[in-house]
């Protein structure tokens, strides 16, 4: 036929059977990719340390999505929360992956069947004997069915009425587990961090979808609207479908990057704003302060800080620290975290407690500056030693560790103090294994960053696709070159070839 590559999809333009076939094949490819990717991730995933080597540090992409929907166990005998299990049941990680691959195979066969048997009676308009689709009716059917699925997910799966519930955690990502969620029908349901809003919104949106679907099945569109929006043209369907997809992609890019109940930090890693705002640092200091108020020693108070909370307060877990073109997981960057060394407290020879100024997100290097509780600079690591006033050596800075592996250890030699001051710029200090994966020491992004980048990019591309196909379908007669002052009225669309002698004409 000699079509250029960008026009090959026109072969299914007036062929409903094969249009259906290629969409079933597309579903087969998507489902097959999901199942295969899940099996690959399970093959390389190490579940042994859910605290310091969680899924998001290992660059897992589909495992977090399965987990947030209630899958936590593996046929390998491990659970995502740690420990071993004996009876994972059919809906394990491997079970879900297998179901997607089986479904992919069935869709593949169905696509072939519909490609071969394309000329079905159901696609034939009995009035003309030609293939046609009742697009408004199909829209109603799809709206109704998606409404049923949406309502069912919110009312049964999320609430635990018939299903496991979803992943729910505390604001600091420490106690996450899969549990049923009650719908939140008040104003709190609009808080993006309230899990109950997921249930209530799916129930409400599903109900609306069911009612709207029934409406579109029972009410025909007015003729002017039908013609004005080109409802008989399949490219209108393409344009509006692309609009729905790019809108959804923009929304989920936002909920992923800024954080929400749908993107728990235990599954996708913390957000960059939690580092920018000192979110975990404040909670750690609050807990230490509460411990001191209970007459605990500084060492005891810091030892009660969960390693998981301390690990969140480390810049290497900030998704904005990885470059867009640095491939690989976070573990391939700064290494696999082995243990928390403890919290370093710096003091000068006058006894002032000093705090290392933390590195902002978008800096690769940052001056080492130590300030006291009033924000006054007391020490630094100078760029030009000849002009230094506040160097570690001059000020006599020492460091002592509280909690972690170095609990109670102190150092006074300047080289060691400066080493830990540099590391304290990056948040809490961890021992990192860079040998196992040959990690290069350059920070990587988490799946949160990759998901956001991918969906924001494709949303932008799909936005242009919506404009393109929307314009093509609305202004098809203009683009085809029909003269608006033509004496003979051409019924454009009955035949799409201009100048075709068989095109029906009606004299005005």
From Swiss-Prot:
It holds the Pfam family PSII. Keywords: Chlorophyll, Chloroplast, Chromophore, Membrane, Photosynthesis, Photosystem II, Plastid, Thylakoid, Transmembrane, Transmembrane helix. One of its GO terms (cellular component) is photosystem II. One of its GO terms (molecular function) is chlorophyll binding. The keyword Cytoplasm does not apply. Binds multiple chlorophylls. PSII binds additional chlorophylls, carotenoids and specific lipids. The chain crosses the membrane at residues 21-36, 101-115, 140-156, 203-218, 237-252, 457-472. One of its GO terms (biological process) is photosynthetic electron transport in photosystem II. It is a multi-pass membrane protein. It is found in: Plastid, Chloroplast thylakoid membrane. PSII is composed of 1 copy each of membrane proteins PsbA, PsbB, PsbC, PsbD, PsbE, PsbF, PsbH, PsbI, PsbJ, PsbK, PsbL, PsbM, PsbT, PsbX, PsbY, PsbZ, Psb30/Ycf12, at least 3 peripheral proteins of the oxygen-evolving complex and a large number of cofactors. It forms dimeric complexes. PANTHER family: PHOTOSYSTEM II CP43 REACTION CENTER PROTEIN. Belongs to the PsbB/PsbC family. PsbB subfamily. HAMAP family: PSII_PsbB_CP47. One of the components of the core complex of photosystem II (PSII). It binds chlorophyll and helps catalyze the primary light-induced photochemical processes of PSII. PSII is a light-driven water:plastoquinone oxidoreductase, using light energy to abstract electrons from H(2)O, generating O(2) and a proton gradient subsequently used for ATP formation. This is Photosystem II CP47 reaction center protein. It comes from Calycanthus floridus var. glaucus (Eastern sweetshrub).
